[in-house]
Amino acid sequence: MVINENLNLMDKLKILTDAAKYDVACTSSGVERRGDGTGMGNSIAAGICHSFSGDGRCISLLKILYTNECVFDCHYCINRRSNDVERASFTPEEICQLTMEFYRRNYIEGLFLSSGVKHSPDETMEELCRTAELLRNQYHFQGYIHMLSLIHI
């Protein structure tokens, strides 16, 4: 597994939103609004998906992975250890900053956060919880958060 430590935030965003599209727990409506490259508004490249709230509203979510690194080699998973893909990881702070910037621009109403298992399920889960805690308590984010719970059987 090759890990590039010199990625900037946009590189990480591209890699980790692209890898998140394989998590079918939140699939988009199928609408593809591509930008022409001259301005803002290309939600396809930004990892925006759509889901429905309890009251039936369609809401936009930033769908990203915390990391696509994984210690496991599950054959069904795109992030499996033996798969030759570019690896990247966010920090909790980076995810919070991205979420808030997307929210302030009214691109999203919430965050869909999933992850590979970086070192251990417990350690990765602690980082995911730290991210949610920062969003709620430091950034005062009141939007929707859907977060994967990692277990190892």
Where are these regions (language model features)?
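Flexible, acidic/Gly-rich N-terminal and inter-domain linker regions that tether
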Residues: 1-69
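Hydrophobic faces of well-ordered beta-strands that scaffold small-molecule active sites
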Residues: 60-62, 111, 143-147
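Short, charged beta->alpha transition segments
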Residues: 63-64, 93-104
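Canonical Radical SAM [4Fe-4S] cluster-binding loop centered on the CxxxCxxC motif
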Residues: 64-93
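Short Fe-S-cluster ligation motifs
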Residues: 101-114
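Conserved glycine-rich "GG(E/T)P / GGGxP" loop and the immediately following alpha-helix
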Residues: 111-130
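Alpha-helix-loop-beta-strand connector modules within alpha/beta enzyme cores
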Residues: 126-144
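Conserved small/polar residues in nucleotide/adenosyl-binding loops
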Residues: 151-153
